[in-house]
């Protein structure tokens, strides 16, 4: 049976005045801890273009090699370390998680401009 890659998308919004601190933590602490999980293929972050308060400012894409890997992440020691770091770093409520959702891969098409 072929493994189906899973994409987990997390949308976040830092509170006013905390964006630099939030990004430093996310890039230098959160992602390095999360990427240690064996079934995590990669993590990619995006920031919305321009000023748009209708949608969350940041999206993080977590790519898991399979549904089994995505399901195993929650109870894993790696996720426990992520959660502990988040709780210790953000004792105050510095950002909002707007949503957190998973999708199963259907198919990938590659264009001529691929690297």
Predicted stretch roles:
Residues 1-115:
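Macromolecular interaction modules
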